[in-house]
């Protein structure tokens, strides 16, 4: 049996008297496409912040590739193979697309133009390499955000609302990129409010509500679950 790439074991997070996560446990297999859904305030962002190292969990353990990483800084987790794209892209607007990619490559100890060119080709931004990031469209900014995450050569990529605000055809573009990256062996956690995108992409989905997992299963099972409909869809 293949060992999981990520185990979240009884993770809790508190902000003062508020419990954002309450003993959340998930296990993700290498190469899996994993969806994370839930209403606003359900704990999705807190969970991925704990996984990526932006926040330190108050209870429980986070194990990546067989090693506990609960107390590692975010940059240490990145170097171990966890990367994340953020919901709101914040590129260096005075830099070109290529320069924006060379910065994270240098951070992880590589600055190869050839590697940057290959990432841009994979993401679909090769023809925008010399373009200032301030001139990019919304979907191009989302692609650049994914490219910057790929600079870390991740084994686990967390895609945080990469399709928010995009048109249907643009959502299809981003989904194709994520499918292609997954086909190369990258495990992907997708956090997304666009339910159709999550259901098309994910092999397995969990739904959070009030910091707890209320349902876990296939996309088909999730959309039919009464608890999910009440919590996430307002039914």
What kind of feature is each model-predicted range?
Residues 2-235:
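Glycine-rich phosphate-binding loops of nucleotide-dependent enzymes
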């Amino acid at each position: 049996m293949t060992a999981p790439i990520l185990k979240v074991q009884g993770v809790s997070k508190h902000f003062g008297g508020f419990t954002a996560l309450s003993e959340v446990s998930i296990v993700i297999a290498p190469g899996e496409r994993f969806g994370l859904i839930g209403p606003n305030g359900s704990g999705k962002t807190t969970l991925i912040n704990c996984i990526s190292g932006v926040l330190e969990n108050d209870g429980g353990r986070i194990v990546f590739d067989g090693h506990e990483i609960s107390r590692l800084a975010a940059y240490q987790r990145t170097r171990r193979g966890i990367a994340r794209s953020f919901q709101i892209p914040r590129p260096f607007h005075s830099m070109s697309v290529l320069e924006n990619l060379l910065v994270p490559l240098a951070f992880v100890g590589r600055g190869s133009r050839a590697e940057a060119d290959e990432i841009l080709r994979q993401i679909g931004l090769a023809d925008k390499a010399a373009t200032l990031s301030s001139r990019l469209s919304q979907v191009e900014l989302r692609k650049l955000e994914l490219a910057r995450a790929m600079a870390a050569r991740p084994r686990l990529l967390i895609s945080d609302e990469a399709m928010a605000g995009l048109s249907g055809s643009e959502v299809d573009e981003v989904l194709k990129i994520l499918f292609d990256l997954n086909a190369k062996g990258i495990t992907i956690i997708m956090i997304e409010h666009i339910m159709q995108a999550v259901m098309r992409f994910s092999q397995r989905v969990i739904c959070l509500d009030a910091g707890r997992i209320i349902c876990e299963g296939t996309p088909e099972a999730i959309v039919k679950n009464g608890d999910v409909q009440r919590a996430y869809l307002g039914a």
